[in-house]
Regions:
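Conserved functional micro-motifs across diverse proteins
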Residues: 21, 25-183
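Sec-dependent bacterial lipoprotein signal peptides
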Residues: 1-24
Length: 183
């Protein structure tokens, strides 16, 4: 066999091996549920969560005022954090319930639970999501708003925001998932 044929055979075998490896990874039944990044959906049971955007909210900023309806000024050294999320119930025949709470956790293990919100953009933890429904609901203020997602509201201290990456913990039907949020 001449060297040109040997090289072609080698390249072909290498491509077959790489393709087989890629296909084997696609067949994995256990989806990764840790270290998800914003914009990457994660399925927990029939509910698919997608964290779109995270940012500190300023109570004195006109743009943020609708997200912070009814909230007092934050204590010195603390800030409000808005985590904007979309959720899809992929079940064709069954409603599913959202977790009753969500948490932000910094690298030192400090935990911050979402706080109640009166905002029209707020996600309501513990709510039922109908079969094949979306949160936020189609044509709702949150869905047609600037971010097009429902908001989870948190209050964090400034020190914890520096302990990155901060993760959103979602305790769903199939156990927890963690999403690295961009603060």
């Amino acid at each position: 066999m001449n060297s040109l044929v040997k090289n072609r055979v080698f390249v072909l075998l290498l491509l077959v091996a790489v393709s087989a490896l890629a296909l084997a990874a696609c067949g994995s039944s256990e989806e990764e549920k840790e270290g998800i990044v914003e914009g990457e959906p994660v399925a927990l049971g029939s509910l698919e969560y997608n964290v779109l955007f995270t940012r500190p909210l300023n109570i004195d900023d006109v743009e943020d005022s609708q997200y912070l309806v009814g909230q007092p000024d934050p204590d010195p050294g603390t800030a409000y954090i808005g985590v904007f999320i979309k959720i899809k119930n992929t079940s064709e025949d069954e409603a599913h319930t959202l977790p009753t709470s969500f948490e932000l956790v910094d690298t030192k293990g400090n935990t911050f639970e979402n706080i109640p919100s009166e905002s029209i953009y707020a996600l309501k933890p513990g709510m039922e999501v109908g079969e094949e429904d979306d949160v936020p609901a189609i044509d709702s203020a949150a869905q047609v708003g600037p971010i097009q997602g429902s908001m989870l509201l948190f209050k964090m201290n400034d020190e914890a925001m520096e302990n990155r990456p901060v993760q959103l913990v979602i305790n769903g039907e199939d156990g927890p998932a963690t999403v690295d949020i961009d603060l």
